[in-house]
Amino acid sequence: MRIFDDIRAGLDRDPATKTGFELFWTSPGLHAIWVYRIAHLLWKARRRILSRILSNYAKFFSGIEIHPGAKIGRRFVIDHGTGVVIGETAEIGDDVLIYHGVTLGGKTLDPIKRHPTVGNRVIIGAGAKLIGNITIGDDCAVGANAVVTKNMPAGTVAVGVNARLINSISEDHYLI
């Protein structure tokens, strides 16, 4: 069940959280993800107004805005989530970790795919902005405050404004 996957992932990726009980009661990121999962089911069932109301509830209580039309995979973790914004056509793979202030935003008002697609096992650092219909490959890392407007091949690291790609991820890269 995805709810238990989300708890396990949160425990695995947040060394400050010691128990599932603690995570359950104190993680705004986890709460926002759970409300998103319910709102997304309602969105797919064409209960759009109710899904948007639930999303606004989560935003009010967590400071995290996830559009119910976004598609998010398993074991998704938002750590220190205040200010996170995930747009309507964003797609996020499995085992993704994002930090506070991250935006997965669009750059057009046209009713098309306008938000990023994020692969599996991606880490997105605090304050990073991923803008437009771009693809972030599997096993990538986006550094804190990077602005990414172009596709990232699998296994790369993006840093800076406008982000530049550096060869590949290694153990000694500290991005966040």
Regions found by a protein language model. Give the residues of each.
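Terminal amphipathic alpha-helical/low-complexity segments used for targeting or macromolecular assembly
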Residues: 1-62, 173-176
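Left-handed beta-helix
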Residues: 62, 67-68, 73-74, 79-88, ...
